[in-house]
């Protein structure tokens, strides 16, 4: 069945193949364009550098009018990532726009890695360390980077 959501997702996939943003990749799982696997490489010159972080994206038929559900599968220690892997990111909630595509979502998440929003933390411990003990925060982040290589 061809729906506008599926057509849009196929356009998003084509863009990811022809004009991939640096440090991110994504593609639909076999036989289901509504679920995607994605990878974000930790940005250079940040504590997340060289990490390979896996995510899953779930789209509903209302996409692009409704944002996808996005969740880290890789362990992530970050102020805006819940223990479940779900993200607290404004563009995936109240600041969503149908103009955002998969590439824009993933690059926004990649930017969030080194520029967390500590005013509304999903992980209070990570937020407190980021604010009050940056050395320990970086140590914990580097541990998740090393774990990302094993996955």
Curated annotation (Swiss-Prot):
SUPFAM superfamilies: UBC-like. GO terms for molecular function: ATP binding; ubiquitin conjugating enzyme activity. GO terms for cellular component: cytoplasm; HULC complex; nucleus. This is Ubiquitin-conjugating enzyme E2 2. One of its GO terms (biological process) is sporulation resulting in formation of a cellular spore. It comes from the Eukaryota. It comes from Emericella nidulans (strain FGSC A4 / ATCC 38163 / CBS 112.46 / NRRL 194 / M139) (Aspergillus nidulans). Pathway: Protein modification; protein ubiquitination. Disulfide bonds: none annotated. Its EC number is 2.3.2.23. The active site is at residue 88. The keyword ATP-binding applies. Catalyzes the covalent attachment of ubiquitin to other proteins. Plays a role in transcription regulation by catalyzing the monoubiquitination of histone H2B to form H2BK123ub1. H2BK123ub1 gives a specific tag for epigenetic transcriptional activation and is also a prerequisite for H3K4me and H3K79me formation. Also involved in postreplication repair of UV-damaged DNA, in N-end rule-dependent protein degradation and in sporulation. It is found in: Cytoplasm; Nucleus. The lineage of its organism: Eukaryota, Fungi, Dikarya, Ascomycota, Pezizomycotina. InterPro entries: Ub_conjugating_enzyme (IPR050113), UBQ-conjugat_E2_core (IPR000608), UBQ-conjugating_AS (IPR023313), UBQ-conjugating_enzyme/RWD (IPR016135). Gene3D superfamilies: Ubiquitin Conjugating Enzyme. Belongs to the ubiquitin-conjugating enzyme family. Residues 4-150 form the UBC core domain. Residues 1-26 are annotated as: Disordered. Keywords: ATP-binding, Chromatin regulator, Cytoplasm, DNA damage, DNA repair, Nucleotide-binding, Nucleus, Sporulation, Transcription, Transcription regulation, Transferase, Ubl conjugation pathway. It catalyses: S-ubiquitinyl-[E1 ubiquitin-activating enzyme]-L-cysteine + [E2 ubiquitin-conjugating enzyme]-L-cysteine = [E1 ubiquitin-activating enzyme]-L-cysteine + S-ubiquitinyl-[E2 ubiquitin-conjugating enzyme]-L-cysteine. CDD domains: UBCc_UBE2A_2B.
């Amino acid at each position: 069945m061809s729906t506008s959501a599926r057509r849009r997702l196929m356009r998003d996939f084509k863009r990811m193949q022809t004009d991939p943003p640096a440090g991110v990749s994504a593609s639909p799982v076999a036989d289901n364009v509504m679920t995607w696997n994605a990878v974000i490489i930790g940005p250079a010159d940040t504590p997340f550098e060289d990490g390979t972080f896996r995510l899953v994206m779930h789209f509903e038929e209302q996409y692009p009018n409704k944002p996808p559900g996005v969740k880290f599968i890789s362990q992530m220690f970050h102020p805006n990532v819940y223990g479940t892997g779900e993200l607290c990111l404004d563009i995936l909630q109240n600041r969503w726009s149908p103009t955002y595509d998969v590439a824009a979502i993933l690059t926004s998440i990649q930017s969030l890695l080194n520029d967390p929003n500590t005013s509304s933390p999903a992980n209070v411990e990570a937020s407190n360390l980021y604010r009050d003990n940056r050395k320990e925060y970086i140590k914990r982040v580097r541990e998740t980077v090393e774990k990302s290589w094993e996955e």
